[in-house]
Amino acid sequence: MLYPELFRAFERVRWDLERDIQWGAFDPNRLSEEQAQTIKMNAITEWAALPATEMFLRDNRHDSDFSAFMSIWFYEEQKHSLVLMEYLRRFRPDLLPSEEELHAVRFEFDPAPALETLMLHFCGEIRLNHWYRCAAEWHTEPVIRQIYETIAKDEARHGGAYLRYMKKALVTTGDAARNAFAKIGVLMASARRTSQALHPTNLHVNQALFPNDTVQSRTPEAGWLERWLDQQIRFDAVWEGRVAERILHNLSLLFDQTFSSVQELNRYRKSLAA
């Protein structure tokens, strides 16, 4: 069981909303309207940890260890939404998301294979870590830069915890886990080949609600994410390459193989079905 160890490890590095964020360093002259608007949209997006947690608990009733870890993940992800909202409450209260705007991103996700979802969210944590690090470089106001740097580290730790559960799944389910992880790994490491931002909040998850069945489609400004990535923080091919490299590196360690490209991972995936 991983939950007790992960709980203690996460407790040791948990940051405090009041004490650890340097609220007094705020510089109003270094926050643009454009930047402030994106903070609101990320606060709403992070609120989608709520329906994601409901999905995880529903689809992992067979796994109480992982379900218990969700109590940690949910707490920390909701705190990401909260710290962004606290920033707006203090410095741009006119942009604070309404309860209705937050509730709009809570909807039911269709059931999906638990191992594929685990891998999808592992890759999502890697991607979000890089998005937030890139956002911290784009922002000019020191407090929001610190916030993005702080929550980026959380996302990296979450990815590390998911990797622990992936290792456990290899022991308990063997090839089923290998197939699931390789399949989703090929998809999520191939983002340079698609214009779509490959993150769980930007994927269709409820067929009955299509096309209004991504988290991003239910935000006040659908399409903001692509603009944020492409035109604002400029998450370019260099950053995207770093995401793919981290996914391939971790799968190399997980499978005791060497994947230097998506093509090599895809060949491995095909070999599993042979």
Feature annotation, model-predicted:
Residues M1-A274:
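Non-heme di-metal
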